[in-house]
């Protein structure tokens, strides 16, 4: 991966994280209306018409929330394959929750999710001053748990929401410092 993606935020071994753009809307809508992907997110598929979704999407791009940041995930060829975000940003506690979606199934179980998580965590901890990044993953989603563990996350608790059981995992900034040799 030697070319620079437009709006590049961070680069991993397999993926580039970049700013979201309006041209992502068709992919994002397709993924948000996909029943299987919604199940992995403990959500219902988005039911609104594309034009309504597009209006909301434009607003999010024009007026981003200070409590969340959404990024596109690209592969080495520059194809938009998913999204990464951090949200529930708490500047006082110096932490944020993360989430990723690989919407293109041909990239599942091939290291792209792990690389996206590692790249996102490294970016957050190096640029924000946060001390902790955490996530919640469904207790039955073994593939996601494996990717998060390979990325350095450790289980720190459990939670329940909307009839779903979640495993809470965390990554501490001090761990990144240890990986870099102090």
Indicate residue ranges for each PLM-predicted region:
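A general structural signal marking secondary-structure boundaries and capping sites
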Residues: 35, 60-64, 128
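Conserved GNAT-fold acetyl-CoA-binding loop/helix
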Residues: 36-58
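Short, solvent-exposed alpha-helical surface patches in well-structured domains
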Residues: 27-30, 39, 55, 119
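Surface-exposed charged/polar residues within alpha-helices that form helix-capping/stabilizing sites
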Residues: 30, 59-62, 122
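A short helix-loop-beta-strand connector motif used in the catalytic cores of GNAT acetyltransferases and
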Residues: 58-72
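Acyl-donor (CoA/ACP) binding surface of acyl/acetyltransferases
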Residues: 2-25, 33, 70, 74-182
């Amino acid at each position: 991966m030697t070319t620079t993606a437009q709006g590049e935020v961070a680069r991993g071994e397999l993926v580039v994280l970049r700013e979201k753009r309006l041209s992502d809307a068709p992919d994002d809508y397709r993924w948000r209306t996909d029943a299987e992907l919604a199940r992995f997110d403990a959500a219902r598929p988005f039911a609104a018409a594309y034009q309504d979704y597009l209006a909301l999407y434009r607003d999010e791009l024009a007026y981003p929330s200070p409590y969340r940041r959404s990024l596109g995930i690209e592969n080495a060829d520059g194809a938009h394959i998913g999204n990464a975000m951090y949200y529930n940003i708490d500047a006082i506690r110096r932490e944020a929750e993360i989430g990723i979606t690989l919407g293109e199934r041909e990239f599942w179980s091939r290291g792209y999710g792990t690389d996206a998580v590692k790249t996102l965590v490294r970016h957050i901890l190096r640029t924000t001053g946060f001390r902790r990044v955490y996530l919640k993953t469904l207790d039955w989603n073994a593939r996601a748990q494996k990717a998060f563990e390979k990325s350095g996350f450790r289980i720190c608790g459990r939670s329940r929401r909307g009839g779903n059981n979640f495993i809470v995992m965390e990554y501490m900034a001090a761990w990144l410092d240890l990986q870099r040799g102090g």
